[in-house]
Amino acid sequence: SDMASAPTCSPLTSPAIAQSAIAAAVAKPVSLPEMSIGSEKAPVTITEYSSLTCPHCAAFGQNVFPMLRSKYIDAGQVRFVFREFPLDIKAAAASILARCIGKDDPEKYLAAVEILFKLQDRLVAQTKDTLFHVGKMHGMSVQEVETCEKDQTQFDKLNADQQYAAQALRVTSTPTFFINGVRLQGALSFEEFEERIKPLLK
């Protein structure tokens, strides 16, 4: 029987074949444009599933991500892929706004995500006002933010990507990271990332 629903502790190392299969499943194109930074040729790919209302995700974004970026991503050793896994409608609405701001530019998108993380408490308490505020910071009118939030196609794509992550990749909580196909759940420190990245760079 399938024990996927039982609480499990994942081993840190899985057989190479399973790992490469998972890596391929993670790399499968999703419905929304891929938001990634770093070299396409980087030996390590980190894919994060994140919710904009999740405090652990915000902590990673503000404390760990800048260090990963300066040491590994900008150096061409790590490619970083940011994927949405909204845990509630507020997070979904914030993700859609970040998509409208970023369009096809991952840097603009990540800048919007960074601001939304900084304003997370406000986003949760006063969702609409915060979305308008962040939109305005990026030159969007109230009308443009409202139009963005009414785009059902975007929400459907977001939902499809989340369903795939939940079913095929067994993502159940945020943040969840995949480092070259190894799944790690929860907020990791920079040191914990480094421990896992370094052996892959040899």
Range-by-range predicted roles:
Residues P43-V44, E107, T172:
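Structural motif
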Residues H56, I89-K90, K157, Q185:
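Secondary-structure boundary/capping motif
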Residues S1-P86, N159-Q167, L201-K202:
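Extracytoplasmic thiol/disulfide redox context detector
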Residues C9, S14, Q19, S51, ...:
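C-terminal cap of thioredoxin/glutaredoxin-like
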Residues S50-L52, A58-K136:
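Structural alpha/beta surface segment adjacent to cysteine/selenocysteine redox centers
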Residues E40-A42, K90, S189:
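Short capping/connector residues at structural and topological boundaries
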Residues V30-L32, K118, I179:
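Residue-level signal for pocket-adjacent positions within structured domains
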